[in-house]
UniProtKB/Swiss-Prot annotation:
One of its GO terms (cellular component) is membrane. N-terminal region is required for phagocytosis of Gram negative bacterium. It comes from Bos taurus (Bovine). InterPro entries: C1orf43 (IPR010876). This is Protein C1orf43 homolog.
Length: 253
């Protein structure tokens, strides 16, 4: 009876150790999978490095080109000139149903206005995102064609832009026409000022390139009369004879 109880206790110990080892292995696998999962979610790049087995030069070229991807921003044209949806605006009916078309036309109108938003180069992606307002206000206070433009005009343009792009209110035909009028006025002012400044630069460059006329240099030769020439020669001979007499006198002493 005692030997049977000892055998059962030994079996229980073995079972406990086996179950404990199994639970430990399962917990280890679970924790490892969770760690790998969070590590993969936190990584921005691919799970395998790009160009892992590529040559060194090719890998560097791949890294250089991939680093330029984050700087690429493109704002496509929303409505083409031959878009069939534009015909819906010409049909009779409730124009409020096509507010989204006026919003798209408002965004495309900025590119069609040919306003040099990128002339300064400080905001190369000024039409992307919310810095459109800060970009124009910044240009308005600097020495650019935007300087001195009426603040009300820029505010009307920017309010219409933000309403068309981000607003949830109504943006119909009247709002679009008001926005288009402000954009056309701003484009006219900027083009006129940029044209005048360009003409001033051209005139200044022309003045710098034109060299002043150089008057020919004249050499004035003064001829002495013969009497003065003879006097100079006589004085030279007297000076030479005096020097010779002085040298002979010094040698005799």
């Amino acid at each position: 009876m005692a030997s049977g109880s000892n055998w059962l206790s030994g079996v229980n110990v073995v079972l406990v150790m086996a179950y404990g080892s199994l639970v430990f292995v399962l917990l280890f696998i679970f924790v490892k999978r969770q760690i790998m999962r969070f590590a993969m979610k936190s990584r921005r790049g691919p799970h395998v490095p790009v160009g892992h087995n590529a040559p060194k030069d090719l890998k560097e070229e791949i890294d250089i080109r991939l680093s330029k991807v984050q700087d690429i921003k493109y704002e496509p044209q929303l409505l083409a000139d031959d878009d069939a949806r534009l015909l819906q605006l010409e049909t009779q009916g409730n124009h409020n149903c096509y507010n989204y078309l006026y919003r798209m036309k408002a965004l495309d109108a900025i590119r069609a206005s040919e306003i040099p938003f990128h002339a300064e180069g400080r905001h190369p992606h000024s039409l992307m995102g919310k810095n459109f307002r800060s970009y124009l206000l910044d240009l308005r206070n600097t020495s650019t064609p935007f300087k001195g433009v009426r603040k009300a005009l820029i505010d009307t343009l920017l309010d219409g832009y933000e309403t068309a792009r981000y607003g949830t209110g109504v943006f119909g035909l009247s709002e679009y026409l008001r926005y288009q009028e402000a954009l056309s006025e701003l484009a006219t002012v900027v083009k006129a000022r940029s044209g005048s400044s360009q003409r001033q630069h051209q005139s200044a460059a022309k003045d710098l390139t034109q060299s002043p006329e150089v008057s020919p240099t004249t050499i004035q030769v003064t001829y002495l009369p013969s009497s003065q020439k003879s006097k100079r020669a006589k004085h030279f001979l007297e000076l030479k004879s005096f020097k010779d007499n002085y040298n002979t006198l010094e040698s005799t002493l």
